[in-house]
């Protein structure tokens, strides 16, 4: 990509290099150093790039990493800070936003560094105080956050995912740990699988285990209602969000904001209660129909456990060209919670959907009770036809995604749109 300057431009791609342009050298493209020089480009690093783009180094960057909860936690911090009167930027799975305005569409969880610097340039122009970003394990291994100075770092949790990229769970865990070796402010989930971290400037949070930010009592009956203690402070979290996993997300979001800006606790409580959640995360898209992005065994278990008081009809699949070992585990978990399970297609990419579906099916013990419907629209239609008054249809895997990737082509597809179309046709 190119970023324009007054009389030149910055690029991270040697194919775009010209005489007198600037080539941003990163860990990923360093091997093309000689090619950039041959074309007459000036080699710069991230710090030099920030100066050329006149990025305000006073902007406080908050990074969130973990298997699940990154998107909701990032959105919660963004919303709370905006409600407290601060100017903020946000980038992650849902796209990029500055001061409540979307400036870029959905992309990678963590963008290439030059794209992130472009967002920070806009954040500077819009006089932002904070910039919140999701940080994936891929980005940590590929050093896509090099040169960024984080004011705060958050660890949500770690469970099996991305073994197609990391090879082993230990490699995946080590990738997450890379983020927490320095002395910056950090927030660590004490109830999650333990990771190594630098204890300097570390704040812990938890429900089950002793932590600096501790939940003392909570109710999840209608939304979330809880009391949080921290040293000599006590404040409430009251939220319409559902589930224990969202309690953790709101706990760390409030802890992070509390440490960074020291707000009046009544203002903090009001800002927390004003956060309505994220599209595609336990989102009720029609009466008795929930759509959620959960696509890992742990994520699926947390969502279904939250909804277990209802009779569940679960529509789900698994993405192609990704960790295959999690597929039977996903099936096993859905079987435990679902009245009816419908296995379908979910971004099969280069793989055959039927193969993925069979691998999910292998996790079921009572296979005769499972419906296999490859066409995702037909699978959703079947679930809605089978739904009785007290049932809850739960459609997992895509959340608010608007495409379905098959053989390298992204076709328009939205679970939410499909549900509403089917219900409209049913009258």
Curated annotation (Swiss-Prot):
Binding site residues for meso-2,6-diaminopimelate: 322, 346-349, 397, 401
EC number of this enzyme: 6.3.2.13
Domain of life of the native organism: Bacteria
Binding-site residues, UDP-N-acetyl-alpha-D-muramoyl-L-alanyl-D-glutamate: 14, 109-110, 136, 142, 144
Pathway recorded for this protein: Cell wall biogenesis; peptidoglycan biosynthesis
Modified residues (N6-carboxylysine): 176
UniProt-recorded Gene Ontology molecular function terms: ATP binding; magnesium ion binding; tetrahydrofolylpolyglutamate synthase activity; UDP-N-acetylmuramoylalanyl-D-glutamate-2,6-diaminopimelate ligase activity
Positions occupied by motif Meso-diaminopimelate recognition motif: 346-349
Protein's UniProt name: UDP-N-acetylmuramoyl-L-alanyl-D-glutamate--2,6-diaminopimelate ligase
Family: Belongs to the MurCDEF family. MurE subfamily.
Signal peptide: none
Catalyzed reactions: UDP-N-acetyl-alpha-D-muramoyl-L-alanyl-D-glutamate + meso-2,6-diaminopimelate + ATP = UDP-N-acetyl-alpha-D-muramoyl-L-alanyl-gamma-D-glutamyl-meso-2,6-diaminopimelate + ADP + phosphate + H(+)
């Amino acid at each position: 990509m190119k970023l324009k300057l007054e009389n030149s431009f910055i690029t991270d791609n040697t194919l775009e290099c010209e005489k007198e342009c600037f080539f941003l050298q990163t860990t990923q493209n360093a091997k093309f150093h000689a090619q950039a020089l041959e074309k007459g480009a000036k080699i710069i690093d991230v710090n030099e790039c920030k100066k050329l783009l006149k990025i305000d180094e006073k902007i406080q960057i908050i990074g969130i990493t973990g298997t699940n909860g990154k998107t909701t936690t990032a959105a919660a911090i963004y919303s709370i800070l905006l409600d407290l009167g601060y100017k903020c930027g946000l980038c992650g799975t849902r796209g990029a936003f500055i001061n409540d305005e979307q400036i870029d569409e959905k992309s990678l969880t963590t963008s290439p560094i030059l794209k992130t610097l472009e967002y920070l340039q806009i954040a500077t122009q819009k006089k932002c105080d904070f910039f919140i970003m999701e940080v994936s394990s891929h980005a940590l291994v590929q050093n896509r956050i090099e040169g960024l100075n984080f004011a705060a770092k958050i660890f949500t949790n770690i469970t099996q995912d991305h073994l197609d990229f990391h090879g082993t769970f230990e490699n995946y865990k080590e990738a997450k740990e890379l983020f927490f070796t320095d002395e910056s402010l950090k927030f660590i989930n004490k109830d999650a699988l333990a990771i190594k971290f630098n204890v300097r400037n570390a704040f812990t949070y938890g429900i089950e285990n002793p932590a600096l930010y501790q939940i003392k009592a909570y109710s999840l009956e209608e939304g979330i209602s809880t009391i949080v203690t921290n040293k000599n402070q006590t404040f409430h979290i009251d939220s319409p969000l559902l589930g224990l996993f969202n309690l953790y997300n709101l706990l760390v979001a409030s802890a992070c904001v509390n440490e960074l800006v020291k707000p009046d606790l009544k203002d903090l409580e009001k800002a927390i209660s004003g956060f309505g959640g994220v599209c595609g995360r336990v989102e009720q898209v029609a009466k008795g129909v929930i759509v959620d992005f959960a696509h890992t065994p742990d994520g699926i278990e947390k969502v279904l456990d939250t909804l277990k008081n209802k009779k569940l009809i679960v529509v789900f699949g698994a993405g192609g060209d990704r960790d295959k070992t999690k597929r039977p585990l996903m099936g096993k978990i859905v079987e435990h919670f679902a009245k009816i399970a419908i296995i379908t297609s979910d971004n099969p990419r280069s793989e055959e959907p039927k193969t993925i579906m069979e691998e999910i099916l292998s996790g079921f013990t009572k296979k005769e009770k499972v419906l296999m419907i490859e066409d995702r629209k037909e699978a959703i239609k079947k679930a809605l036809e089978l739904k009785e008054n007290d049932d809850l249809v739960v459609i997992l895997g895509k959340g608010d995604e608007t495409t379905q990737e098959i053989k390298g082509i992204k076709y328009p597809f939205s679970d939410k749109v499909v549900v509403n179309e089917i219900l409209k046709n049913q009258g």
